[in-house]
């Protein structure tokens, strides 16, 4: 703190330009750590009143677009190697200001090494770097400093939705969204290697993570650019296709047509375009690309699920995510993704050499421990997986109880239908089946054995073992001269939370 006070005593103009990003830094940390806005977190910033916190945030967002204002620029070192002044403020320079704000808590000139170590070891800390992931290309050394800090990076749209309730000011929020989207689009255009561009639009009433609450087409384009911020090339045609898919009634044919319309722009970038539109708690995923790119359609669907679940899967930084066994928590369900390597040997002629082709298959597993933990929280079983009766449903009719248990079981089997190993899924079905039997036996005040003997075992097989008809996703080979259909196993995203089903009255 003494070093900070020493820097603030240099010059009055320098004090203003230095105080400005410090205030901005504090509130960004407040947004990331879910603290109240009238609470100092890292630095005691002089020169403002805590009671005027909301006004300060509004003024900061508004003055970002005002010219002739002092802003910190890391490239301009005419006055000081650490501080610079730039009078002409444009949208492309906002990223420099954000980058310098990130530099402040990591600078050894301002914060001592012990305080810095304490900040880095904070388990709840989500740095500014995670809120603005498009700054990863500007400072490469953040990959080494912040590897442990970011288990769950914050999605830009989630930040905007949080600011929307705090600021109560639509124009300033649109200014901030335009600034962040412009910098994100510039960073995405600078990336040479283009990955799969995924645009996710979720319903506001559901428990989805990313919610696009913009009516204008430009706001929808900004949401699409934010969703594909992880080294993806988002073209204007792809954004228009995403807006058209969101405007439609989320029909599978309409989504496929939208993906086919964007296939021309996606083929130029040599990447598959995946569009996921969610409406009425049902999501339809469609992808159209070349035959070689269609083989990785499962990976593209995983990228769309990652964008919807606000998890950024960076190709070089997957190890940063502190998730147990590479599991992915998506809308209340758990999924474990694994690459199964296999070897295919081929021989063209009888005396020719054997050719080894290594194949990595994208497969999903049924995670037993997270699912049993989720079922135990919903009071279907205990922590050891032993089924228990659901006392809250004893007042319902028998058909209603069986319908609710059967719906959960069908959703689970439908969600994990792409998994190759179904043994764990059958154990989960057994837990739900016996929990339903115990609930019905408790309602009729009898034992489970007597209740099953009176009704018969086929009584439960009718609604628990019969699964819904599955949807087969086929991908046409657009660029191949041989027209055909490529079918691949895929897991489904049209699922409902266990807790929502368990808490229905």
Curated annotation (Swiss-Prot):
One protein family per Pfam: Intron_maturas2
Principal cellular location given in the protein's record: plastid
InterPro entries in alphabetical order: Domain_X (IPR024937), Maturase_MatK (IPR002866), Maturase_MatK_N (IPR024942)
GO cellular component terms listed in the entry, alphabetical order: chloroplast
Entry's Gene Ontology molecular function annotations: RNA binding
Compartments, as annotated in UniProt: Plastid, Chloroplast
Tagged with keyword Nucleotide-binding: no
Keywords: Chloroplast, mRNA processing, Plastid, RNA-binding, tRNA processing
Record HAMAP family: MatK
Annotated function: Usually encoded in the trnK tRNA gene intron. Probably assists in splicing its own and other chloroplast group II introns.
Protein name: Maturase K
Organism: Allamanda cathartica
Gene symbol of the encoding locus: matK
